[in-house]
Amino acid sequence: MKYLVTGGNGFIGTNLIKRLLSDGHEVVSLDNLSTGSINNELPNADYYYNTVEYIHICLGNQKFDGIFHLGAASRVQPSFENPNQTFRYNVSGTEAVCEFARENKIPKIVYAGSSSKWHNPSDSPYAMYKYIGEEVCKLYKQTFGMDVEIARFYNVYGDGESVDSKWGNVIGIWRSQVSENKPITIVGDGEQRRDFTHVIDIVDGLCKIMYNNIKHEDAWELGTGINYSVNELADMFVNKFGCEKKYIPDQKGNYRATLRENLDAVERLGWEPKDRLKEHIDNL
């Protein structure tokens, strides 16, 4: 099989391409390197560099057996600084990918949604535009009869995660702070809870969605079903590194909790996520 991965130079995309190659597939990546790195290129995959809005220009009428659409402007806080770019990548880019698939009769798209869907979309440009991206996918599914599956991610961490303070998740940011002998910064009171899901499990979920012919009327929820407070995570870091903690003011769009409750991916796809958080911190 031949698959296209948008966002293939990013954290999740790179891990996904590794899995697809190990499964014996051909892989093409399209990435604009806004958060991904050219250093993440893997042998035996083909790489193109541009935004997904220009997918038709970059890839022409190439045929694929499926598209994993991961390419997006990620993270809540940067979306307040550049809402227009977030709209272009997350809405216009998603429409372009769906239209490319329709015109080239590509059988399936798996779209990377977000658990922010479960909070008020108006809380941030990121949440709103990921929500609209899902609606674009549903439009193409319902109007054109396409197989467009939505996979909602819950707080992904693991090997290759960004340590950039702007684009990284809390684990990546804290890793950077620890390496510089700085206190780890806790936003707000630290009692906000997150369903931390290892990238290995996210990739396995994505592949199960793509490889199976099982369709979901809404979205596949990819989370462990267990959440930790940020304070609990901070205690793991303190126990591992002996670092200090520093509380900073809360931020816009910082929702109180994420937790996967829907069991469809587990029950219908046989997906088996594991709680790997403490093991991951211990092995840093």
Where are these regions (language model features)?
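C-terminal substrate-binding subdomain of Rossmann-fold SDR/epimerase-dehydratase oxidoreductases
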Residues: 178-284
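Residues in well-ordered alpha-helical elements
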Residues: 65, 77, 84, 95, ...
